[in-house]
Amino acid sequence: DRRQRQMCIRDRMGSATLLVWQTIKQLKMINLWHVFQQMAHLGVDSLPIISLTLLFAGAVMTLQITDVLITYGAQSTVGGLMAVAMGRELGPILVGVVLAGRVGAAITAEIGTMKVTEQIDALRVMAVDPVGYLVVPRVVACMIMVPILAFYGVVIGIAGGYFVATAIKGLAPSTYLDSIQMFSTISDFTLGLLKSSVF
């Protein structure tokens, strides 16, 4: 039983490695039309759920930390703290998790259905490589859209924090915005975008 599990793990790792290698080999023959279709399907259609998730994440985080910072007289750091936390960590991670759930499930269901209905076998019969036709456009679309969506999510999260800090906690809008300029740097956001592309 243990040996069978080990064999199963090795078999899956080998299959995954082979799929990655085949995908890399097929990257030089990208169908741009399919890539744009997948960018719209996987990226643009994910905007509503990313907006809700990051908006409430930024709002709740600001709600939690503002009282503590006000207690210590550090309310002028709220915006900067939110920008750094969202740009470096929370934004890319939350966007990655949301897309893994939504996009991963959608791709799995779509390709699984094609496998069951023998559409993938039909592609092979027509001398069309299923990896190049199905996998590569989705991989390229994700590589392009995830950093864009991560940046969008960071902006939405900071906006959610801005609303809570100014409308609920009574901070001056200029205090929040000046704090962002003072404590955050471009590298905070570029680092987050690099992380999101890896996700």
Where are these regions (language model features)?
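Active-site cofactor/substrate anionic-group-binding motifs, chiefly glycine-
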Residues: 38, 42-94, 98
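Hydrophobic alpha-helical membrane-insertion segments
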Residues: 50, 144-158
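Membrane-interfacial helix-loop-helix connectors in multipass membrane proteins
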Residues: 64-87, 155-197
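A hydrophobic alpha-helix feature that marks transmembrane segments and, especially
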Residues: 97-115
